[in-house]
Amino acid sequence: MIVFASDVHLGLRKGDPAERERRFVGWLRGLSLSKGDSLFLLGDIWDFWYEYKYVVPKDGVRVIAALLDLMDRGVEVYFAPGNHDLWCFHWFEELGMHKIDPQPAVFNLEGKKFMVAHGDGLGNDKKSFLFLRRIFHSKFCQALFSTLHPRLAFGFALRWSDGNRRTHGHYVWKGKQERLYQYACSQPSDIEYFIFGHFHTPVDETLPSGARLIILDDWIDGGTPSFTL
């Protein structure tokens, strides 16, 4: 069995953050996964994640414990950093997770061939987006950010996240006009599934090749959205 989830946004100051964490932990603990099964977390599990040399975020400690329990049972856990938690450098791998980097990545598991990524950069050629992405991925900028005290760094980042969400609001999927849809159509025809997050709106469309394009919903306002192969 292969299970996918994304966009939990642990720590997001909207609604009830503690309830959201409990809901996600309950879902993880209820998964009927065993040795040889796989769990793919496709980004933005945390609303903000940044690793210092000796410090990691406190939000989602019970989530980490639940993931460790799954790995102790022999479940393979894969993590694709999103645009909110891209600064996960080494700690998840030290815990035993598989970091998906670079993205997208193609897997062939249990007889199914699929491409996964968070989805924020695929097919997007807007100059403003590419500029901001280069800054976020810059080793120099990351080193500068690391000089900030965590209290200042996390306060700034969470306010940025809140403001960005209020500015952009709810996203409306544009179907065949979407750059991500067009990107998936341009990929090899033997890929059976394209599975992404990021857009915060559920999508399940069949491409001209017969492949399925799956966009995972977010966990912000309730439910336990996921996809299973």
Describe every region a protein language model picked out:
Residues 32, 51, 55, 90-94, ...:
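Short amphipathic alpha-helical patches
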Residues 5, 10-109:
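Core catalytic region of metal-dependent phosphoesterases/phosphodiesterases
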Residues 47-70, 148-152, 163-174, 183-191:
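N-terminal short leaders/motifs
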Residues 1-3:
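Extreme N-terminal starter segment of soluble prokaryotic enzymes
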Residues 98, 102, 113-115, 120, ...:
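Conserved beta-sheet core of the metallophosphoesterase superfamily
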Residues 38-44, 74-80, 114-118, 136-143, ...:
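Low-complexity, flexible helical/coil segments
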Residues 26, 69, 90, 94, ...:
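Charged/polar, solvent-exposed surface patches and flexible loops
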Residues 119-179:
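Active-site-proximal loop/helix segment associated with metal-binding centers of metalloenzymes
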